[in-house]
């Protein structure tokens, strides 16, 4: 339903509101309070003053830091976006940020930013190198089917057992060993359960064979009555035959 007060245009449609005209408050785009507080405490602890480490940030000071940092980063990104746009690029790189600092008259921050950037890049390089060292070379000539994958995993496990000194800290190998152990335990438990079920079925069959089938008591009574009636009929026939003989 359109907002109150809107009227249809000549085409019979309601005009759509312009999203660019929507006002955005600075409180909606503030940086996380914990991040800003951690950075501020690191700066205070890094200072040479003795009482700086015991300083506490007030609530109003934290709000001021959050808002000022948001405005600073927004202004810096605007300058960097203009530089990348002038060079015909759609992405912003590290050099654009350094040029934006110089253009925004914050040249004093450039040495500190370069130092932090070099530390960050070195950490990323070390992380990639450590990750590459952990990778195990795959054996050649192995298909990608599930059965071949299992054989490949088993081969890798044999290699890892032989070269335990080199592959001791490999988390992928430990995970593969845990998975194989779990599968083996599941197979053992399934076999035990199937054996127990078969034994229980055999015991039930033996009990059924050994037990005598009990007859219905009503059927027994009816059978006894039929037998008595048959005996009485036989006695009557004998009596009639004896009387005929006497006559």
From Swiss-Prot:
<comment type="subunit">
    <text>Heterotetramer. Consists of four subunits: POL2, DPB2, DPB3 and DPB4.</text>
</comment>
<dbReference type="GO" id="GO:0006974">
    <property type="term" value="P:DNA damage response"/>
</dbReference>
<feature type="compositionally biased region" description="Acidic residues">
    <location>
        <begin position="224"/>
        <end position="247"/>
    </location>
</feature>
<dbReference type="InterPro" id="IPR009072">
    <property type="entry name" value="Histone-fold"/>
</dbReference>
<keyword id="KW-0235">DNA replication</keyword>
<dbReference type="GO" id="GO:0006272">
    <property type="term" value="P:leading strand elongation"/>
</dbReference>
<protein>
    <recommendedName>
        <fullName>DNA polymerase epsilon subunit D</fullName>
    </recommendedName>
</protein>
<feature type="compositionally biased region" description="Acidic residues">
    <location>
        <begin position="196"/>
        <end position="215"/>
    </location>
</feature>
<feature type="region of interest" description="Disordered">
    <location>
        <begin position="128"/>
        <end position="247"/>
    </location>
</feature>
<dbReference type="GO" id="GO:0046982">
    <property type="term" value="F:protein heterodimerization activity"/>
</dbReference>
<dbReference type="InterPro" id="IPR051377">
    <property type="entry name" value="DNA_Pol-Epsilon_Subunit"/>
</dbReference>
<comment type="function">
    <text>As accessory component of the DNA polymerase epsilon (DNA polymerase II) participates in chromosomal DNA replication.</text>
</comment>
<dbReference type="InterPro" id="IPR007125">
    <property type="entry name" value="Histone_H2A/H2B/H3"/>
</dbReference>
<feature type="compositionally biased region" description="Basic and acidic residues">
    <location>
        <begin position="150"/>
        <end position="159"/>
    </location>
</feature>
<dbReference type="GO" id="GO:0031490">
    <property type="term" value="F:chromatin DNA binding"/>
</dbReference>
<dbReference type="GO" id="GO:0008623">
    <property type="term" value="C:CHRAC"/>
</dbReference>
<dbReference type="GO" id="GO:0008622">
    <property type="term" value="C:epsilon DNA polymerase complex"/>
</dbReference>
<dbReference type="GO" id="GO:0031507">
    <property type="term" value="P:heterochromatin formation"/>
</dbReference>
<keyword id="KW-0539">Nucleus</keyword>
<feature type="compositionally biased region" description="Acidic residues">
    <location>
        <begin position="165"/>
        <end position="188"/>
    </location>
</feature>
<dbReference type="Pfam" id="PF00125">
    <property type="entry name" value="Histone"/>
</dbReference>
């Amino acid at each position: 339903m359109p907002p109150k007060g809107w009227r249809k245009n000549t085409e019979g449609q309601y005009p759509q509101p312009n999203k660019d005209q929507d006002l955005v408050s600075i409180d909606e785009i503030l940086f996380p309070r914990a991040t800003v507080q951690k950075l501020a405490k690191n700066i205070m602890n890094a200072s040479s003053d003795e009482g700086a480490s015991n300083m506490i940030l007030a609530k109003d000071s934290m709000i001021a830091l959050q808002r000022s940092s948001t405005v600073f980063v927004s202004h810096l990104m605007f300058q960097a976006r203009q530089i990348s746009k002038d060079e015909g690029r759609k992405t912003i790189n590290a050099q654009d940020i350094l040029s934006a600092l110089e253009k925004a008259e914050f040249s004093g921050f450039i040495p500190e930013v370069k130092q932090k950037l070099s530390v960050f890049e070195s950490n990323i390089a070390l992380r990639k190198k450590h990750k590459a060292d952990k990778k195990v070379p795959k054996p050649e000539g192995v298909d990608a089917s599930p059965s071949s994958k299992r054989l490949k995993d088993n081969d890798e496990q044999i290699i890892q057992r032989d070269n335990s000194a080199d592959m001791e800290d490999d988390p992928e190998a430990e995970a593969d060993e845990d998975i194989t152990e779990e599968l083996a335990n599941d197979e053992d438990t399934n076999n035990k359960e199937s054996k127990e079920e078969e034994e229980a079925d055999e015991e039930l069959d033996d009990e059924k064979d050994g037990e005598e089938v009990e007859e219905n008591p009503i059927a027994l009574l009816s059978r006894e009555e039929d037998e008595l009636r048959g005996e009485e009929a036989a006695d009557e026939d004998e009596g009639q035959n004896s009387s005929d003989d006497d006559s």
